[in-house]
């Protein structure tokens, strides 16, 4: 058990970054959110109720260095695009507590929706094996693709254009 954090970090670093396209229905989920700049604590994020906008789902945890490195980029992307896309961060619990996640988003003044996956069901349903992983869900609720590893603002912008073009 003491080697689990090291193993997870190695999986993340050795996997590199990659994008994969998908076309299956995104498994629905509801998570209770942490308090962020734009969201109140205990608000529920329900993927099915996202108003026909595409949704970007980021799977992360606080002791994951690439997860932490990409969070400010995702937040900047969210601030620039929040009228046209939903963004939600889903924290893996186990290595870090929910309190660790809440403390991180508060300390970093994160704006987008962030919450925990207490039983790991969302991560399992999305087949998450590498952290961070970012999943792109189109406005019809289909998974358009996913990115494994740290993501850049440029890649987020490119994926948003693809999601928007797919809707037209």
Residue ranges and their predicted role:
Residues 103-110, 118-161:
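Thiol/disulfide oxidoreductase modules built on the thioredoxin-like
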Residues 68-108, 118-125:
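Structural microenvironment flanking redox-active thiols in thiol-disulfide oxidoreductases
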Residues 53, 84-85, 111-112:
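A generic structural signal for alpha->beta connector loops
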Residues 62-69, 133:
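C-type cytochrome heme c attachment motif
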Residues 53-55, 60-63, 130:
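Short pre-active-site segment immediately N-terminal to redox-active cysteine/selenocysteine motifs
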Residues 56-57, 87, 134:
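Hydrophobic beta-strand anchors of alpha/beta hydrolase catalytic cores
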Residues 1-38, 145-146, 157-160, 168:
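N-terminal targeting signals for export/organelle localization
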Residues 30-55:
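A short beta-strand-turn-helix
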